């Protein structure tokens, strides 16, 4: 009991010795080498508990996007690694030590390389800002308080009430990471991510467009991507700030298209839904006069709905379709698929190589539109 109370005292003495600015801005007790070690342990846990999707071409494609973003705008010295988590839930997250993750479900919902670059830039920014390490430090503070409560309870005969408070381990650390960041951290990651996209040659409007579409989807389904909840009053302001900064960046340089065809082509064969569903993504090239409903009847499994096709492609069920459009569709394993008439090039329409940076690459951006 004495050692636990001493630990609490030492911890809070350390907190009180920190400058006010460090406490206000968020601080971390984790060194960079500690982040790398912890990131490796968390990566093992994620792989063991959730599993990774390792199709070589898709993995190489996603890794190339992350490398391009890191070269353009990340100030950290980590070796960044990106992995595809083999689950249907729509999410992307970063841990510590340069580990970035995107789920199968998120890849399904994105519509272009530029949107994926925006999501990855946002997560890389959380690593650059050490947001996860700060979360871990806060969690440790709560854990130390919990240990103090155990010791105090023991002196009062109530120790059994605290038996569930285990020391902060890897599982607890992962739970902390998967929880939402505070609004300030999300705004800063948006800001840095948008600038990183522009520096890498990606149109920053892609991230703003995705955030807006995701908010609409959350209203319909109740499913959310961390830090973006449609019921929060700050969400609309956050999206508006992202759109304003994206337009400001676009006014300073030109960008190529979003890379929709190249992105969708890389998704062909990606499992859809839960692993046991035995469904996968395919592409369908629209012919003159076709509707979403007629395409569903023509090529999709009976259990798939018109709404599902529309949602995958961010359309409404009665939207008119242009001949030649490429739609993402869901088919059963082994089901023959009508292939697009033209040969698709997985590099066609990819954004151009990055232009010269807009500013010093190691500067953490802060502007009038996306500041705290």
Regions found by a protein language model. Name each.
Residues 3-4, 19, 44, 114, ...:
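Alpha-helical protein-protein interaction elements
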Residues 2-17:
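Bacterial N-terminal signal peptides
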Residues 18-158, 178, 195, 199-202, ...:
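Peri-catalytic and regulatory segments of divalent metal-dependent proteins
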Residues 26-31, 40, 52, 60, ...:
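Extracytoplasmic and endomembrane cell-envelope/extracellular-matrix remodeling and assembly machinery
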Residues 1-2, 238:
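An N-terminal domain-start capping segment
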Residues 71, 367-371:
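Surface-exposed, polar/charged interaction patches used for macromolecular assembly or partner binding
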């Amino acid at each position: 009991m004495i050692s636990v109370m001493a630990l609490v005292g030492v911890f809070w003495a350390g907190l009180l010795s920190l400058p006010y600015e460090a406490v206000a801005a968020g601080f971390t007790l984790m060194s960079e080498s500690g982040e790398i070690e912890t990131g490796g342990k968390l990566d093992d846990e994620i792989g063991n508990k959730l599993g990774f999707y390792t199709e070589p071409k898709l993995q190489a494609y996603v890794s190339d996007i992350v490398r391009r973003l890191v070269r353009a705008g990340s100030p950290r010295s980590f070796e960044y690694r990106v992995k595809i988590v083999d689950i249907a839930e729509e999410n992307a997250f970063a841990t510590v030590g340069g580990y970035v993750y995107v789920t199968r479900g998120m890849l399904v919902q994105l519509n272009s390389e530029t949107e994926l670059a925006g999501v990855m830039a946002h997560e890389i920014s959380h690593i650059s800002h050490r947001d996860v390490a700060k979360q871990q430090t806060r969690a440790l503070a709560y854990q130390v308080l919990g240990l103090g409560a155990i010791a105090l309870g023991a002196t009062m005969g109530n120790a059994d009430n605290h038996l569930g408070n285990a020391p902060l381990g890897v599982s607890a650390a992962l739970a902390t990471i998967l929880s939402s960041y505070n609004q300030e951290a999300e705004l800063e990651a948006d800001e840095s991510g948008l600038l990183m996209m522009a520096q890498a040659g990606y149109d920053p409007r892609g991230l703003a467009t995705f955030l807006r579409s995701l908010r609409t989807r959350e209203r319909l389904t109740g499913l959310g991507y961390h830090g973006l909840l449609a019921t929060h009053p700050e969400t609309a302001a956050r999206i508006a700030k992202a759109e304003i900064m994206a337009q400001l960046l676009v006014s300073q340089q030109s960008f190529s298209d979003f890379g929709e065809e190249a992105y969708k082509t890389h998704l062909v064969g990606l499992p859809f839904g839960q692993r046991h569903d035995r469904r996968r993504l395919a592409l369908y090239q629209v012919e003159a006069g076709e509707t979403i409903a007629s395409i569903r009847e023509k090529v999709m499994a009976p259990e798939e709905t018109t709404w599902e096709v529309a949602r995958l492609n961010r359309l409404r069920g009665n939207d008119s379709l242009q001949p030649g459009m490429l739609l993402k569709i869901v088919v059963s394993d082994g089901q023959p698929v009508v292939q697009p008439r033209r040969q698709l090039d997985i590099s066609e329409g990819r954004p151009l190589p990055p232009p010269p940076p807009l500013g010093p690459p190691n500067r953490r951006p802060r502007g009038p539109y996306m500041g705290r």
